[in-house]
Amino acid sequence: MATMSNDAAAAATWHNNTSTPMDTTEPATNSHNPGETAVIGGPEALLLPSGSGPEEMNRHPLLMAQAHGEHHQPRLLHNFPVIPPPIQQHQQPPLLQQAQPSQIPHPTQPQIDPTMFTQQSGFNWPPIDPNTIAALAQAQLASSHAQFVSLALTLDPTLLSHFLATQQIPPVPQPLVHKKAEMELRVGNRFRLGRKIGSGSFGDIYLGQNIQTNEEVAVKLECVKSKHPQLHIESRLYRIMLGGIGIPEIRWCGQEGDYNVMVMELLGPSLEDLFNFCQRKFSLKTVLLLADQMLSRVEFIHCRDYIHRDIKPDNFLMGLGKRGNLVYIIDFGLAKRYRDSKHQHIAYRENKNLTGTARYASINTHRGIEQSRRDDIESLGYVFMYFNRGTLPWQGLKAVTKRQKYELISEKKISTRVDDLCAGYPEAFAQYLNYCRSLGFEEQPDYGYLRNLFRTLFHRQQFCYDYVFDWNTYKFYNESLEARNNFQQAVPNQRRH
């Protein structure tokens, strides 16, 4: 047998430095198929450019770290397929990526030692002739390394068998020949997890699908290691509110791995989203249509002995399909019971931290007073004026800390007279806020009186209860306006004689 050169010895040394398998089981999204989830595997030492010799390989940061006994978590690189972990017996293999024809090495090209891949992958290959290994060691200096890696990364059994056949290596064991297996994340055994669509008070919300009925759902996840887990409390409140108009239904709740999971009815965009869509300005008709439904949702929560404590446009969503005109209320992560089963009201307390969203919080909440029904109602009033005005006077205040910003908002809110806040808008809005601020801590709001303020205004304006909101007509208005402008540019006005 011929003696190996120094470069060949260096290449063999490189094999020894990279032969230790890495722990690679971190999930990631496959860039070639965004809807699929794959498992990253294999060392970054394989991701070397074409023409890399021993010197370039030894300069690779991961190889240098491995030489010193360090291990790094691999990362998915753009446009690189992924290497599945070793396939155990009776284990369904992960999704494989098809190799391109250009990735098949030519039989006459020198190839890298397949034992490197054997060591990295954990596959049990049949014994290889030592003479063949020695001969292949010389080929490690060739520029065909990237070609081998390009093929090996795909791990397509048919193509890999073709490659090994060019080296007179026994074919791939039959258990590795298989069809593609779809990879996906599921919760509750029947809900497929998709992309992230939002965030709540204590968790992220993802789009999901019931694989049995094809119904799309919303999936809320919360880490079980959260300092103050709230999702199980929120799911219980949804069940307490079950049956109310504008209350989303729960499909499933439980724990999956390190996450608490709640699967619920999928809803449409939030009022904040629609407000932005309409250039941050709602017409009076839309505000009154929304106010009527939003008041009813809050009243229903109160009649079930709870207060919401986080009233804001983001927590009111429109329905989908036939319920597209129905306003829903969501996110009970901060909700609190204000009276017990005997209708005993909670005690009045002070020096409470602010709970909720400062922009819409009541004045008493800013003052540290325990919240009750009056505070939810007052917060609604600020939301209505936000829709009318586009902004509130206490928005955009700058401060170094969050506490300082809350203090600035509180000072500005207290110093702003209701008449000034509602100047230029129908008197019903000022009457609404003045009534809310006059309520006692345990006093029950007169929801009917408040609704009639806006219904009377609605009829006085001769609006129609057709449930046509601004966002229903905004798109068509823009399209017609654009068409008219294009027509005027194409057909200029001509002087008449």
UniProtKB/Swiss-Prot annotation:
Quaternary context: Monomer.
Job description of the protein: Essential serine/threonine-protein kinase that regulates diverse cellular growth and survival processes including Wnt signaling, DNA repair and circadian rhythms. Casein kinases are operationally defined by their preferential utilization of acidic proteins. Positively regulates the expression of components of the heterochronic pathway, which regulate developmental timing, such as the transcriptional repressor lin-42 and microRNAs such as let-7. Negatively regulates cell cycle exit and cell fusion to prevent the premature differentiation of hypodermal seam cells into adult cells.
One example of a Gene Ontology biological process annotation: signal transduction
Active site positions, chain numbering: D310 (proton acceptor)
Signal sequence, start to end: none
Location, primary (coarse class): cytoplasm
Ranges of compositional bias, category Polar residues: 14-34
Species in which this protein is naturally found: Caenorhabditis elegans
Location of the region described as Disordered in the Swiss-Prot/TrEMBL record: 1-58, 86-109
Keywords: ATP-binding, Biological rhythms, Cell junction, Centromere, Chromosome, Cytoplasm, Developmental protein, Kinase, Nucleotide-binding, Nucleus, Phosphoprotein, Serine/threonine-protein kinase, Transferase
Name recorded for this polypeptide: Casein kinase I isoform delta
